[in-house]
Amino acid sequence: HLHFWQNKASDAVVDLSVFHYDTIIFSVLLAALTFFLLWAAARKANPGVPGRFQAAVEMLVEFVDNEAKGIIHNAESRKFVAPLGLAIFVWVTLMNTMDLLPVDLLPSIWAKLVGAAGGDPAHAYLRVLPTADVSGAMGLSVAVLLICLYYNVKIKGLGGWAHELVTAPFGTTKHPPAAIVLGIVNFAMQIIEFASKTLSHGLRLFGNMYAGELIFMLIALMGGAFALTGTGIGLAIGHVIAGLAWAIFHILIIILQAFIFMMLALVYIG
């Protein structure tokens, strides 16, 4: 359950030649579902009394728009950033929600399909939670970084942004030797800031969802230990109680982590 469906084994901690097919497939499918849900809500929008689905989407749109207004004061930029924030929130929420599926449901179906096709079902790996894959979570945060860099250049100009890279946060001086030293220090601090923001943005989402996935696996092991003994029956009952309690609590984590990821994206872009 902790192995990915990938093209090859990783040769290093960071190996950009490794592709996790399951993360890519589920991310794309859920992105398509996000697009469809928002498109369906927009298509059915009318000035009359809204249905429950339309009302829920309108509340969500208004909520995200208000959050964007408090961070991004340029109305023209908000026309892109606010819908982006909405898409991020819905997409990450849907990806996180995959953690509520039974641990063995889709992997067992996939193993049977691979076995029926003549493959080895014991090595038919499949992980359905894209945000519990560090490459998936970091991919999202890197995308936010690229948008942030784009707006830096768009608003400040390439020259203005380059000037900021070597003059902030410690400023500069008219003395050339000191200006060079300050420029190097400022540039290093800017790189550290961008890197730390991107790492913390992605790893926060990954860490919370990966931990939640592990807890679900541990709870599933309790159910797998069922036997007609006092201990086995106790573990099975504990499996049901713990599974229900953690699933209810995890719903809050799913929404909260999507909200935090969206808010940080708006803050970084803003």
Q: Which residues make up each language-model segment?
A:
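Selective transmembrane helix interface/packing segments
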Residues: 1-270
